[in-house]
Amino acid sequence: VHSKKHMTRTTRAGLGGRLLSLGAGLCLAGGPLWAAQSEDGDTRLATVVVEGAARSEAQKAEARLKKVPGAAVVVDNKAVEKGRATNAEDVFALQPGIFAQATSGSGANKISIRGSGLNTFYQGYALGIRYLFDGLPITGPGGTQEDYLSMNGIDHTEVLYGANAFDYAATSLGGAINFVTHSGYTAPGNYLRLEAGSFGYRKQQLSTGGVVDDSDYYVSIFHNERDGYQHDTPNKGQELVANLGHRFNERLDTRLIVRYREETLTQGNTLTREQIKHDSNSNKVPTGRKKDGSTWVGSTTTYRFDDDSRLQVGLSVNDYPLLNGWRYSATPQDWRSTDTNLTLRYLRSQDRLFGLPSDTTLTFSSTRSQFADVKSHSRATGQLLQHTDYTGSRDTVFAFGNELQLDPRLWLVSGLSAINIDRDVSIEYSASANTSEFPSAVSYNKWYAAPRIGLRYQLTPDIQLFGNASRSIDPPVTWQLGSTGVPYIRPLTPQKADTLEVGIRGSVGVVDGSLTLYRSWVKDELLSVVVRQATATADALVANSNASPTIHQGIEAGLGIQLWEGANGDRLDLRQAWTLNDFHYRGDSTFGDNELPSLPRQVYQAQLNYQRHDGYYAELNARAASSYYVDYANSLGAPSYTLWGAKLGYQAPGRRWEVFLDLRNLTNEHYATAANTAYDAKGRDSANFYPGDPFNVTAGVAVRF
């Protein structure tokens, strides 16, 4: 993306000048194991019986991700459900390095990890991150459908930053997010949850789960509605989640997961800074999208050859229609897509390589668009305006990974991914003639390599150092090459990045934390710009292109402190997260070293939580975001903001029932939650900002029976 004139970039915060002191650690109580000596003098180990609660699936995932030589976190939904639990903004709060904000308070979310999908627009798809359900991808050649990011029926969520998502065949700059569905083991019994709040928000959930002999089941239904803060922005959805598992014997088990969701959503138009301040619920040009039934069916089967090796076979089908612009748009579009995926994983642990302990993983994942196209029509006449076809496009990854234990404290992690990108995009019909220099069809099949190497060092039993070097490959999704806005296909090349990452994580006493620094040298970054804003008579026009070389670098820091613990078990805890984003051009011929727009330079989050031993809890939280540019010329910035919130609640023993009150934006701040990206705003206040919700309250109650 290039501008027409150069503007001097404002000074960025240097990485070297930003440090966050992190203590680490939780005191673990333990006792000695004494050797018993028999009467004849033989020394034998005494039998020790350890009793305690079994680890949850989220805790098991957290222990597994500690072996990753880079940033990776697990979000347990039990913690999320102590307040409003409706979208990605709720789930990823207090996670450094992750930007997740709802646009206009709706289910459309801007989600970015380390600047991935930097200026994605919000019309049904998410970019820059590989999303999965239970290890099977929902991201395909056309991107990821936002309606699948409802966060319903989830036990926990794994977030692996950048190349640390290697084992999930993720090769994107942002890494991967894996949503793990509840099963009959994690959510037994019957469960009813009701939420209601400001701006007509309502959500209902009813689920049942259990274990019968060698089988387990979980079935849940959801319904959500919201009238909206901006005028005329209602949205509603209903969803079914089912998870059925069966264990045939000690070697073989299988699981079938089904997700079905219907959704209608009306999005408010973006506003100027002046409107954000004085008329933030204005909505002159609403847009709407409708999903009349997205269906994802996935199956995973695991065969254990022995205690140390196993094969996982995954199959999935993803059918996702999208009626974009079904309300108000002058040229509504009908998107129809069906993807299939095959995933194979072979895992070998407790092996030997060069005489050293070794774990090896082989992964194959291929997602193909069996059918994919978009048709646009004139609302006034019903005439077909354009038909663009994407059928046959495919993303395939072969990955080999190994973890080699060099000594009792040091592990070498290496890997290589071979990536095959197949794009087949053609305009089958257009009412407008193609008079541009670009073709009406693009078809290519290319291979890329993405190596990875890292080290993990156990400094103490509770403190870990890590570092890695990697390459990421982000192919353009099909519709970025061309959809219905123009009668030509714009050839785009995959985005490539080389990344260095170092960090520390662990715990000491009552303190735990993590600190990660990274720098990515990006080539051909895929960037978007809103060329024309939507009006009452014309739809928005968004252009995509490969940029000149850019830099993505930053600091991600998290810190947790137990401030106080009473004799009866009452606790006071403070959690903090700080993110520094520094994304900019590298000597662009027009932009120089200008900042890349769309994400805050700094984000600070904090949560002070008081938990009583009898189940009552109270929380005070804060989120502060700095200003950032919304155009490549760096002439117009989003205002900074600070939001305060609070939670009150009670959980009965065993969580048999619970109730909460979630208060947000206590000071009624008028702010922009996210922004579109302009080419050159020329310093003029323009409509690029999504308004955040003012003061709002959500109440909820849940019962297990």
Which residue stretches match the model-derived regions?
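C-terminal beta-signal and adjacent terminal beta-strands/loops
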Residues: I473, K523, S627-Y629, Y650-F705
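N-terminal periplasmic "start-of-domain" segments of outer-membrane beta-barrel proteins
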Residues: T47-G83, N109-S112, I129
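Membrane-embedded beta-barrel scaffold of Gram-negative outer-membrane proteins
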Residues: R304, R310-N324, R368, Q458, ...
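Extracytoplasmic beta-strand/coil segments of soluble accessory domains associated
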Residues: E57, E89-L136
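Gram-negative outer-membrane beta-barrel transporters
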Residues: L412, N420-I421, R519-W521, A543-D631, ...
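Structural signature of Gram-negative outer-membrane beta-barrels, strongest in the C-terminal barrel
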Residues: N249, R352, L356-T367, D389-K523, ...
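Transmembrane beta-barrel wall of Gram-negative outer-membrane proteins
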Residues: G189-Y191, A196-E225, Q230-Q267, G288-R310, ...
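Short acidic/polar hinge/loop motifs at secondary-structure boundaries
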Residues: F121-Y122, I129, D134-Y161
